[in-house]
Amino acid sequence: MGKLVGAPKGHDRYRDPKTHQITPALYRVRAPFFWRNTIALFAVSSIPLAVYLYTFKKMGDDDLGDIPIPPISDEELQKLKLEYENQK
């Protein structure tokens, strides 16, 4: 196994060795890909956003009226209310 010392050759021209900030050369290298990457970001992020909005709309339209509620006696209801008040 070889030793790795320092940054790989050729990569030091893209960062300032003292401040480690991006140099104008790296901006020039990245420039052709900026708009393509931006469009890809919007395309990929629109899929989960569309799923979320569709689900939110469908759940908002549902009144849940078709779900049967089991009958409960008045005695049982009073017991549950008492338990609820005691838990507070």
Curated annotation (Swiss-Prot):
Keywords: Membrane, Mitochondrion, Mitochondrion inner membrane, Transmembrane, Transmembrane helix. GO terms for cellular component: mitochondrial inner membrane. Required for assembly of cytochrome c oxidase (complex IV). The keyword Transcription does not apply. The chain crosses the membrane at residues 33-55. It comes from Candida dubliniensis (strain CD36 / ATCC MYA-646 / CBS 7987 / NCPF 3949 / NRRL Y-17841) (Yeast). This is Cytochrome c oxidase assembly factor 3, mitochondrial. Residues 56-88 are mitochondrial intermembrane.
